[in-house]
Amino acid sequence: MKVLIKDNYDELSEVAALEILELIDKKPDCVLGLATGSTPVGTYQKLIEYYKKGKVDFSKVTSFNLDEYRGLNGEHPQSYKFFMNNTLFNHINIDKKNTFILDGLSNDIEKECIEYDKKIDNKGGIDLQILGIGGNGHIGFNEPSEELSISTHLTKLKTKTIKDNSRFFNSEEEVPTEAITMGIGSIMKARKIILLINGEVKAEIVKKLINGNVSTKVPASLLHLHPNCTVILDKEAAKFI
C-alpha cells in the first residue's frame, strides 16, 4: 500500500483527478469504479473542469458505482444515482448507457447483485477503483464484521454509518437501514485502487488503517493485500500517523 500525504483537500482531489485523466489518455475505453459521499466530490469537480477545457474525453468510458441505498429510486435526491448524475455525469460527455449503478428498488436483489458482478466481468473488470472510507473503516457499504462478503450483496447498515450519513438527510430516521454494495472481492479485483481520505474526523480510522493489523473489523485494512493500492490523505487525516 502506497501512502501519499497532500497539504489539503484541493491537492488530494487534483492528484486523484490526474490519475483518472492519465488512465483515460492511455485507455479511452477504460472502466472506472466510482464512489459517492463527500470525499470524491472535489475529484469529480476537477474532472469536470478538465473536460470543459477539452483535456479529457469520457465518451468511451464505462463506470460502475460501488453501492446504492435499498429503497430509494434514482430520482430521490439522496440516491447515489441522483448524486452521480448531479455531481459528475450531467456535466461531462460520458454515455449514460455506460454508467452502471445498482437498483435500490429491485424486486430481486440476489439477481441484481449477481448480474452486476457479471456486467463488470463482461466489461473486462475495473481498471481503476476510487474509494472513500467510513468512520468505522467501511469501504463501499462493507461494514465491520466477523466475516465479509466477497461479491455484491445486500447489507444492513451499522448505527454509526446511519448516524454519519444522516447529515445528508433531514433526520437520522430518514436514512435507509440497508444498502446494496459491491463486496470486498469485487473491489479487490480492480487493477488499481485509490483510497481518498480527508479531514481530521477521519484521523482515528486512518491510524487504524495504516498502523493496525489487517482485519475484517476494519474492512479498508484488507486493501493492504491489494498489489496496486494508493491511499491519498490530506494533512488533517494523517495527523496521527
Swiss-Prot record:
The yes or no answer to whether the keyword Hydrolase is present is yes
InterPro entries the record matches = Glc/Gal-6P_isomerase, Glucosamine6P_isomerase, Glucosamine6P_isomerase_CS, NagB/RpiA_transferase-like
Q: Does the keyword Transit peptide apply?
A: no
Q: Which GO terms describe its molecular function?
A: glucosamine-6-phosphate deaminase activity; identical protein binding
Q: What is its EC number?
A: 3.5.99.6
Under the heading CDD domains, the entry gives: GlcN6P_deaminase
Question: Per its UniProt entry, which superkingdom is the organism in?
Answer: Bacteria
Annotated catalysed reactions:
alpha-D-glucosamine 6-phosphate + H2O = beta-D-fructose 6-phosphate + NH4(+)
> Which NCBIfam families has this protein been placed in?
nagB
Q: Which HAMAP family match?
A: GlcN6P_deamin
Q: Which PANTHER family match?
A: GLUCOSAMINE-6-PHOSPHATE ISOMERASE
The identity of this protein, by name, is Glucosamine-6-phosphate deaminase
- Organism from which the protein derives: Clostridium tetani (strain Massachusetts / E88)
Q: Which gene encodes it?
A: nagB
